[in-house]
């Protein structure tokens, strides 16, 4: 199984990324070290995580140990939409800061983190305008080669359809919560039809025991002599979806990477497809945002 997807602009993106939410200091450094050693070449961060510089510093020190350059890894960061009227100025400032933090001349992928700014409510009528201005600012930075690909996160079909009125560059990625108990079939099919890579975050439901102890997946994991986590990640990628798996445990990161080469049988894949409970396990509720 190929280890990369091709985005709509031809850019290659590794199927599995190491997520860095809540990772800082020695924990972040050590898990990045282990991840690089077993083959990870994609790392996911965000302005909101406040760890871009720590990730950049870790990569600067660690990449030479593995005979790698900064261009050999795919880096995603995410930025919330801006409230107010100066989105281009703020986006330019933030992207330049991210480039400095991460030691890059360009960013591989930047996502609009959520369909509203941090400082507005879900039902604020201005959210659509803030999304528009922030997206157009991101398009400008892609045109200026500061960013190779741009996309969204936590966007529903309505949010993407709304973009048709003003975009000149379609989103390359939509990153949302996705796992066997929350399969988002309609959104996933919409993204596939529109050549938007559907990328999962929180694929293990933030460690949700109902998900990880699901008897069907436990049996499949036992058959493959692996963990339920590896089965879930393999199922996601085998369904032609990208995935971000967050951990600060190096051994767990190494175990998760085995999913890149694990192949489920057609029957196993179908059995997991039947486990949808339409149940989100994290607090993000993009579908509630106007």
Locate each region found by the language model.
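Acidic-and-aromatic substrate-binding clefts and catalytic sites of carbohydrate-active enzymes
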Residues: 22-26, 46-54, 82-89, 118, ...
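Beta/alpha (TIM)-barrel catalytic core signal, keyed to glycine-rich beta->alpha loops juxtaposed to Asp/Glu
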Residues: 116-290
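N-terminal binding-site loop/beta-alpha segment at the start of enzyme catalytic domains
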Residues: 1-73, 204-205, 271, 288-290
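CE4/NodB-like, metal-dependent polysaccharide N-deacetylase domain
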Residues: 90-112, 140-142
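Acidic (Asp/Glu)-rich catalytic clusters
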Residues: 7-8, 56-70, 99-104, 164-167, ...
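A short, structured active-site edge motif that brings together acidic residues
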Residues: 69-83, 109-113, 178
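Short, acidic/polar
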Residues: 23-36, 86-101, 158-160, 182-183
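Residues at the N-termini of beta-strands
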Residues: 42, 106-109, 149, 173
